[in-house]
Regions:
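Alpha-solenoid repeat scaffolds
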Residues: 65-69, 86, 90, 121, ...
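Active-site or metal-binding loop neighborhoods of secreted/extracellular toxin and effector enzymes
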Residues: 131, 140-142, 153-154
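Long, contiguous interaction/recruitment modules in multidomain scaffold/adaptor proteins
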Residues: 1-43
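Acidic, Ser/Thr-rich low-complexity linear motifs
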Residues: 89-103, 137-146
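Conserved positions within tetratricopeptide repeat
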Residues: 70, 74-77, 122-125, 129, ...
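Amphipathic alpha-helical repeat scaffolds of TPR domains
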Residues: 39-84, 88, 100-113
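Alpha-helical junction/boundary sensor with strong preference for TPR arrays
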Residues: 80-94, 131-136
Protein backbone atom coordinates (compact mmCIF):
# COMPACT_ATOMS: atom_id res chain seq x y z
CA UNK A 1 0.00 0.00 0.00
CA UNK A 2 1.35 3.42 -0.95
CA UNK A 3 2.47 6.16 1.36
CA UNK A 4 -0.48 8.37 0.40
CA UNK A 5 -2.98 5.67 1.37
CA UNK A 6 -1.25 5.14 4.71
CA UNK A 7 -1.37 8.85 5.43
CA UNK A 8 -5.03 9.06 4.41
CA UNK A 9 -5.89 6.17 6.76
CA UNK A 10 -4.43 8.12 9.68
CA UNK A 11 -6.59 11.17 8.91
CA UNK A 12 -9.94 10.72 10.57
CA UNK A 13 -11.98 13.78 9.64
CA UNK A 14 -13.30 14.53 6.17
CA UNK A 15 -12.15 18.14 6.53
CA UNK A 16 -8.63 16.92 7.25
CA UNK A 17 -8.68 14.73 4.13
CA UNK A 18 -9.96 17.58 1.97
CA UNK A 19 -7.34 19.97 3.35
CA UNK A 20 -4.58 17.39 2.83
CA UNK A 21 -5.61 16.77 -0.78
CA UNK A 22 -5.74 20.52 -1.45
CA UNK A 23 -2.27 20.97 0.03
CA UNK A 24 -0.96 18.06 -2.03
CA UNK A 25 -2.44 19.55 -5.23
CA UNK A 26 -0.87 22.93 -4.42
CA UNK A 27 2.54 21.34 -3.98
CA UNK A 28 2.20 19.47 -7.27
CA UNK A 29 1.44 22.79 -9.01
CA UNK A 30 4.54 24.33 -7.44
CA UNK A 31 6.67 21.44 -8.71
CA UNK A 32 5.21 21.45 -12.22
CA UNK A 33 7.52 24.12 -13.74
CA UNK A 34 10.59 22.45 -12.22
CA UNK A 35 9.54 19.05 -13.56
CA UNK A 36 9.01 20.55 -17.03
CA UNK A 37 12.45 22.15 -16.82
CA UNK A 38 14.06 18.86 -15.78
CA UNK A 39 12.32 16.95 -18.57
CA UNK A 40 13.30 19.47 -21.24
CA UNK A 41 16.84 19.83 -19.91
CA UNK A 42 17.58 16.12 -19.76
CA UNK A 43 16.47 15.54 -23.35
CA UNK A 44 19.39 17.72 -24.44
CA UNK A 45 21.86 17.40 -21.56
CA UNK A 46 21.94 13.59 -21.70
CA UNK A 47 22.94 13.76 -25.38
CA UNK A 48 25.55 16.43 -24.60
CA UNK A 49 27.03 14.40 -21.76
CA UNK A 50 27.18 11.16 -23.79
CA UNK A 51 28.90 12.99 -26.64
CA UNK A 52 31.44 14.61 -24.29
CA UNK A 53 32.33 11.19 -22.87
CA UNK A 54 32.98 9.94 -26.41
CA UNK A 55 35.09 13.02 -27.21
CA UNK A 56 37.19 12.55 -24.06
CA UNK A 57 37.91 8.88 -24.89
CA UNK A 58 38.69 9.63 -28.53
CA UNK A 59 40.86 12.61 -27.57
CA UNK A 60 43.01 10.35 -25.43
CA UNK A 61 43.56 8.02 -28.40
CA UNK A 62 44.27 10.97 -30.70
CA UNK A 63 46.66 12.59 -28.21
CA UNK A 64 48.67 9.37 -27.89
CA UNK A 65 48.80 8.91 -31.67
CA UNK A 66 49.84 12.57 -32.29
CA UNK A 67 48.18 12.26 -35.73
CA UNK A 68 46.03 15.39 -35.76
CA UNK A 69 45.19 15.02 -39.45
CA UNK A 70 43.71 11.53 -39.11
CA UNK A 71 40.12 10.48 -39.67
CA UNK A 72 39.75 10.38 -35.89
CA UNK A 73 40.80 14.05 -35.67
CA UNK A 74 38.11 15.06 -38.14
CA UNK A 75 35.57 12.90 -36.32
CA UNK A 76 36.43 14.68 -33.06
CA UNK A 77 36.14 18.06 -34.80
CA UNK A 78 32.63 17.18 -35.98
CA UNK A 79 31.67 15.87 -32.54
CA UNK A 80 32.97 19.01 -30.84
CA UNK A 81 30.74 21.17 -33.04
CA UNK A 82 27.81 18.89 -32.27
CA UNK A 83 28.57 19.08 -28.53
CA UNK A 84 28.81 22.88 -28.74
CA UNK A 85 25.36 22.95 -30.35
CA UNK A 86 23.98 20.81 -27.52
CA UNK A 87 25.73 23.11 -25.04
CA UNK A 88 23.95 26.11 -26.58
CA UNK A 89 20.61 24.29 -26.34
CA UNK A 90 21.24 23.44 -22.67
CA UNK A 91 21.91 27.11 -21.98
CA UNK A 92 18.71 28.08 -23.81
CA UNK A 93 16.68 25.71 -21.63
CA UNK A 94 18.36 27.04 -18.48
CA UNK A 95 17.57 30.63 -19.45
CA UNK A 96 14.01 29.79 -20.51
CA UNK A 97 13.25 28.54 -16.99
CA UNK A 98 15.18 31.26 -15.18
CA UNK A 99 18.01 28.95 -14.11
CA UNK A 100 21.69 29.84 -14.08
CA UNK A 101 23.03 28.80 -17.49
CA UNK A 102 25.67 26.13 -17.82
CA UNK A 103 29.00 27.92 -17.52
CA UNK A 104 31.32 26.17 -19.94
CA UNK A 105 32.14 23.21 -22.11
CA UNK A 106 35.32 21.25 -22.71
CA UNK A 107 34.19 20.92 -26.33
CA UNK A 108 35.51 24.45 -26.96
CA UNK A 109 38.84 23.59 -25.35
CA UNK A 110 39.28 20.33 -27.27
CA UNK A 111 38.34 21.98 -30.56
CA UNK A 112 40.76 24.88 -30.00
CA UNK A 113 43.53 22.42 -29.08
CA UNK A 114 42.79 20.34 -32.16
CA UNK A 115 42.99 23.36 -34.47
CA UNK A 116 46.15 24.57 -32.75
CA UNK A 117 47.84 21.19 -33.24
CA UNK A 118 46.71 21.12 -36.86
CA UNK A 119 48.30 24.53 -37.39
CA UNK A 120 44.87 26.11 -37.97
CA UNK A 121 45.61 29.01 -35.64
CA UNK A 122 42.92 31.40 -36.88
CA UNK A 123 40.28 28.70 -36.39
CA UNK A 124 41.63 28.06 -32.89
CA UNK A 125 41.41 31.77 -32.06
CA UNK A 126 37.85 31.88 -33.40
CA UNK A 127 36.85 28.97 -31.14
CA UNK A 128 38.46 30.71 -28.15
CA UNK A 129 36.53 33.91 -28.93
CA UNK A 130 33.30 31.93 -29.13
CA UNK A 131 34.08 30.28 -25.77
CA UNK A 132 34.73 33.72 -24.25
CA UNK A 133 31.34 34.90 -25.51
CA UNK A 134 29.81 32.19 -23.29
CA UNK A 135 31.75 33.35 -20.25
CA UNK A 136 34.62 30.88 -20.45
CA UNK A 137 38.10 32.20 -19.78
CA UNK A 138 40.04 31.18 -22.87
CA UNK A 139 41.98 34.45 -23.14
CA UNK A 140 45.36 32.95 -22.18
CA UNK A 141 45.06 30.22 -24.78
CA UNK A 142 43.85 32.73 -27.37
CA UNK A 143 46.75 35.13 -26.70
CA UNK A 144 49.26 32.27 -26.82
CA UNK A 145 47.89 31.16 -30.19
CA UNK A 146 47.87 34.73 -31.50
CA UNK A 147 51.57 35.00 -30.59
CA UNK A 148 52.24 31.85 -32.63
CA UNK A 149 50.55 33.47 -35.62
CA UNK A 150 52.56 36.64 -35.07
CA UNK A 151 49.69 39.09 -35.29
CA UNK A 152 48.15 41.63 -32.95
CA UNK A 153 45.09 40.64 -30.90
CA UNK A 154 41.78 41.94 -32.27
Amino acid sequence: MGLLNRILRTITKDDDVTEFRKELADREKELEPFLKYQEELHKVFDKYLALMEIIEKEWSILYNSKDYSSKLAYKIEKECYEAINYYKKVREVDLKYGETPMSGSKAFTKLALLYERQGEFEKAVSVCKQACSFGMDERKRMLRIIKKVGRAPT
